[in-house]
Amino acid sequence: MSSFSESAILVRDALVARGLETPMKENGISREEKKERIEEHMREILSLLTLDLSDDSLEETPHRIAKMYVDEIFSGLDYANFPKITVIENKMNCDEMVRVNDITLTSTCEHHLVTIDGKATVAYIPREKIIGLSKINRIVRFFAQRPQVQERMTQQILVALQTLLGSDDVAITMEATHYCVKSRGVMDATSSTTTTALGGIFKRNPATRHEFLSGIR
């Protein structure tokens, strides 16, 4: 029996159908075994880098990294961690834009496994359903907690909300600093990357699109 919620399954299937799911293969390994095996491999990697793991500052580092990967920064790879979603019937007939600004996110670049640090703004036009505001933040965080490219992450959040709300009228914009650009390679400390995903009325109606984009701080 699946440990995934109905919402998690709906979102996952919608992403797979659109070719937007993060590339991953289920391996049937438990969380605890994953942590044990990652710790072993990380111990070998750090030793190859000539670090002395008998030093009291480093001896727990492989364990800490393994726990961080599975339980924290890559926890969004497991749909068992998909947030519990609350939607209610739109009995108040709200039909104006709902926008959540400045949602902080920290993700990890899937190419170099270094930090992506930024903010997202999410909006939707209520139709039949209204979603709990904190659930929007939690959905952003879920998709941030996996190796990512920003373009895909933006689209994943869009499709997740469209699926849960039963409406295409959703918009996302995201601005982030990529440490694969800032701390290595070109070493550009000031640039940021902006991505936008628009659905429904946000895509086809210039006035609605302008209202959304002009309201971003």
Curated annotation (Swiss-Prot):
Top-level taxonomic group:
Bacteria
Q: Name one GO molecular function term.
A: zinc ion binding
Q: Which Pfam families match?
A: GTP_cyclohydroI
Q: Which chemical reaction does it catalyze?
A: GTP + H2O = 7,8-dihydroneopterin 3'-triphosphate + formate + H(+)
Gene3D superfamilies cross-referenced by the UniProt entry: 1.10.286.10, 3.30.1130.10
Q: Which InterPro entries match?
A: GTP-CH-I_C/QueF, GTP-CH-I_N, GTP_CycHdrlase_I, GTP_CycHdrlase_I_CS, GTP_CycHdrlase_I_dom
Task: Quote the record's binding site residues for Zn(2+).
Answer: C109, H112, C180
Top class in the EC scheme: hydrolase
Gene Ontology cellular-component annotations: cytoplasm
Enzyme Commission identifier(s): 3.5.4.16
One GO term of the biological process aspect: one-carbon metabolic process
Pathway per the UniProt entry: Cofactor biosynthesis; 7,8-dihydroneopterin triphosphate biosynthesis; 7,8-dihydroneopterin triphosphate from GTP: step 1/1
Q: Which UniProt keywords apply?
A: GTP-binding, Hydrolase, Metal-binding, Nucleotide-binding, One-carbon metabolism, Zinc
Q: Which PROSITE patterns does the record match to this protein?
A: GTP_CYCLOHYDROL_1_1 (PS00859), GTP_CYCLOHYDROL_1_2 (PS00860)
Similarity annotation = Belongs to the GTP cyclohydrolase I family.
Quaternary structure annotation from Swiss-Prot or TrEMBL: Homomer.
Name of the protein in its database record: GTP cyclohydrolase 1
Organism, by scientific name, is: Aliivibrio salmonicida (strain LFI1238) (Vibrio salmonicida (strain LFI1238))
